[in-house]
A protein has these predicted regions:
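Eukaryote-skewed repeat-based solenoidal scaffolds used as protein-protein interaction platforms
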Residues: 1-109
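Structured C-terminal portions of repeat-based eukaryotic scaffold domains
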Residues: 74-183
């Protein structure tokens, strides 16, 4: 059922957005923004667009990356499992787009922790959905393997990157964890 947002809710949302322009990492404001979005039934697409705008303004905005991952987790969790498994399904395609977006962030500033932690979150989501049967094991292995190949290329371009070795090792362990998952 649709309900028209109140003027107070619209004002709160506008205030949150103004405050986040001033202090992009203010997680208290981000939490309040999410609460208001939930109350107003703001679509996931609109929320993802908002987080993308904040990331474009500041790729080091850890809060924007974090809330983007929360939204993706929510989207996939609420999506019908069959549509996720469907070849070329929009949710699976969205996961690939997110991984590409993240890779761009890593190439832009490989010593910034925000994109690395977002990558970790995305890989953990892939593992979670493979283990729960929402995502086919082969698809999960392919997604993670592609990321490891991209990280190997990044390693050649930026051998002194401080986070690369640790995250690459962790992602390799996660890949092995789902390779051993019984289908």
């Amino acid at each position: 059922m649709y309900r028209c947002p109140s003027l107070l809710e619209l004002r709160e949302l506008s205030l949150c957005e103004a405050l986040l322009k001033l202090d992009q990492r203010n997680f208290h404001c981000w939490n309040h923004w999410m609460l208001i979005c939930n109350m107003m039934n703001v679509s996931t697409e609109e929320r993802l667009a908002f987080t993308m705008k904040r990331i474009e303004e500041n790729p080091s905005n850890y809060s924007a990356w974090h809330f983007r991952c929360e939204l993706i987790n929510k989207t996939i969790t609420e999506t019908n499992a069959e549509s996720v498994l469907k070849e070329g399904g929009s949710t699976l395609l969205h996961s690939c787009v997110e991984l590409d977006l993240n890779l761009n962030g890593l190439y832009t500033e490989c010593d910034d922790q925000s994109a690395w932690y977002y990558l970790r979150s995305l890989v953990y989501l892939i593992v979670k959905f493979v283990k729960s049967g929402v995502l086919a094991k082969e698809k999960g292995v392919a997604l993670i393997s592609n990321e490891l190949e991209a990280l190997a290329e990044l390693e050649e371009a930026a051998p002194d990157c401080i986070y690369l070795t640790d995250f690459k090792t962790e992602i390799e362990h996660l890949l092995h964890a789902i390779e051993w998952t019984v289908s």
